[in-house]
A protein has these predicted regions:
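Formylglycine-dependent sulfatase
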Residues: 2, 18-152
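Bacterial N-terminal signal peptides
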Residues: 7-16
Length: 152
């Protein structure tokens, strides 16, 4: 009886040890910024004082090269979030929504959401009329988020 109890206790200990040692999913913070140049400390700028962004970059991924297909925020962001080129999703300007051309496309945030991550949008990801639409959902994509926050 003692051996059986000891065996069960050892198995439970091994099980809980493996559960506790299992890697946890990382937090993912996607920051989309309008008109941000590389004048940040994490990119080697000696004048800019950006300690908070620098700390985020040091603990995550700092991209060294960036490209976009069109010099406007809406087509570029729609392309990044869908993984499709602007000519595929027919978004060339600020007043077009990618769902009109590809209604069933799964966005990057939906990929995370479908795999159990909590997804939220704070501020602008796609496009809205500035300043009139600040504080609204604007040109958003509701299937992509569980929660939205619209700063004023």
């Amino acid at each position: 009886m003692r051996r059986a109890s000891l065996s069960v206790l050892c198995m439970l200990g091994a099980f809980w040890g493996s559960v506790l040692a299992a890697p946890q999913r990382p937090n993912v913070l996607f920051i989309a910024v309008d008109d941000l140049a590389c004048t940040l400390g994490c990119y080697g700028d000696l004048i800019a004082k950006t300690p908070h962004i620098d700390r985020l970059a040091a603990g995550g991924v700092c991209f060294e090269r960036a490209y976009n297909q069109l010099p406007l925020c809406n087509p570029t962001r729609a392309s990044v979030m869908t993984g499709l080129r602007p000519d595929t999703i027919k978004v060339y300007d600020l007043d077009q929504h990618f769902r009109e051309e590809v209604p069933g496309v799964v966005t990057l945030s939906q990929q995370f959401k479908n795999r159990g991550w909590f997804t939220a949008r704070v501020g602008k990801i796609y496009h809205y009329n500035v300043p009139a639409s600040i504080g609204t959902d604007g040109f958003d994509d509701p299937p992509s988020w569980e929660k939205t926050v619209n700063p004023k």
